Every structure is written in C-alpha cells, then in structure tokens.
Amino acid sequence: MRQKAAAECGVTLPAAFRFVDLSLENPTDPGYFQEKAFWDANPRAGELDSYPTLGSLQDVKHPVGDADELVKSGDWAIQGHADYLPERLAAVHASLTNTSGPPTIFYAHCNAGCDRTGEFFGAYAMSYLGYNVTTAMGEACKQCGRCPNYYATNSIGWWCLTLEAQGRTDVGPCMDFASCKPLGDCTAHNATPLEDDCPRLGLGV
C-alpha cells in the first residue's frame, strides 16, 4: 500500500496509522464472508467497517411519490434511511478529522469499485469537500473508468437533493447531471472532474 501510494500519487503514508477497510458490499457479494473472516483472524492488521449499500430504485427525475417527502424520509433508498449516508458519512468524517491519535486511512470499496463506491465517495465529497454534483459524478466516472450505475447515480442525485433541502445552494443540477438506462448504465452530463488525478484536498468542515 505504501509503494502504491507513492508510485501512483507521490504520497508518503505516515509511519503509524489506523487502517480501516470500509466495505460497502452486501452478503450476496462474492468474497463478503471471506473478507470478514480475514479481519476476524487478523485484528492487529486493521479493522473492518461494514456499510452494506444498496442505492436507489427511485429515478430522481421521475420518482414514484412526492420528491420532497422522499427526501425528508430518506425512503428514496432501497433500504430506506437515505441509504444510511448521514450517519456513515459523519462517522468517516469524524475519524478523518480526529487528531487525538494516529491518522486514519480508509480503504473504501464495493465489488467493482464504481457503483456503491461512487455513491459513497460522491456523497462524502458533496457533503464535506465542497464538490457540486457534476464534479462528484465526474470524479466517480473518471476514477473508475465508467460512470456509476442506475442505483448509485440516482442515490447521488437524491443525496444532492437532500443537501439542497438542508440549505445548500451550491450543489448544482441535482436532477440533470446524468442520464441512465432503466436499471442499467449511466452517462454524465457536463461532468466537471478535477484536473488532478490525485486530488489533495482539505477534509472540509
């Protein structure tokens, strides 16, 4: 990991750090139970935070039901509770900004590294790094090599609307940043990814 960070982005990891494997996978994913077994057997190597993520079946452009009520309740997500993004994003942010111990390094992933990962990182970046939705989507597409799928892209849109409902005025076009085939692939509209492939940004507030 140290060699990869240095080779790909010129980043030198600290001598001591807390390593967290942040898994967005579900029990139906290949390798889910093997990953859990590894961390159970190797607790000194790091820790596993399991954040099962399902995304949204609700098309953010054409929802079934009242969009404002879906945002308020979080029922736009398959598992409700806004896909548990509020508490999960806050927990990650608290760990990243905690200066009372060694720094925390999160290795967040799903199965492909594009869809649920794109949803989670996109939501975090909009919440804490000041990204608007076209930058969040642009980075998700660029870093993976393809755009997040229907479930994840709609989640990004719903999270954008959630932030807008909380008073954010800088999140961009929450309902017009992408187009998706029904339950399939998505294409970004006017994506604005960062120029740096290895962005070095503050942690936000």
Model-derived segments and spans:
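Cys-dependent protein tyrosine phosphatase-like superfamily
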Residues: 1-112, 119-205
